Amino acid sequence: RSDTHETKRWYSRDWESYDAVKDNEASSEAIRKALEDAVKRQLMSDVPYGVLLSGGLDSSVISAIAAKFAPKRIEEDGKEAAWWPRLHSFAVGLKGAPDLEAARKVAKHIGTVHHEINYTVQEGLDAIRDVIYYIETYDVTTVRASTPMYLLARVIKSMGIKMVLSGEGADEIFGGYLYFHKAPNAKEFHEETVRKLKKLHPYDCIRANKA
């Protein structure tokens, strides 16, 4: 507030509190529906779109859901064929990277038009100055992860793709990082997922949004 020079919180997410969620029952069907609904909402688009497919679990799930709905126009409740019925997927990496092979297998399975972009170490080094300029941070981890995404984004843009979906945020929501396995109890596991979610915006989301 400008009159008191104080920061006031106007909205609280009830799921941040462990006590508010500790008795919730796990439901794979509820998770499936929430994921499908979330992806489907993003496909209401009159411009070409694609998916970032690393070959990992998170991006593979999002890509598979997108591929399920892509052939029909979401805007018409699935009653008309989509203007761009073939979903395009994109992967980036050094030649021979195991993730690229995994992405190929997933793309073949879900039927996307797959594009694999390779870059060299020197190309990555040459791009760092531009990457730092665009993401507006010198954070080493963020710059390192943003560099291949920046190189990939340039190719995607040159193809006329205006929007892409990715698997960002899944590890934070579902505790996918390896160190989560060492959580001493459910309460600390939950508190760490909340902490990671709060850190998404200044780190991973900056990379995904600005690269």
Task: Please identify what each model-predicted range represents.
Residues R1-E6, G169:
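Short acidic-glycine loop/turn motifs at beta-strand connectors
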Residues K8-W10:
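Conserved S-adenosyl-L-methionine
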Residues R13-A211:
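ATP-dependent adenylate-handling active sites, centered on carboxylate activation for C-N bond formation
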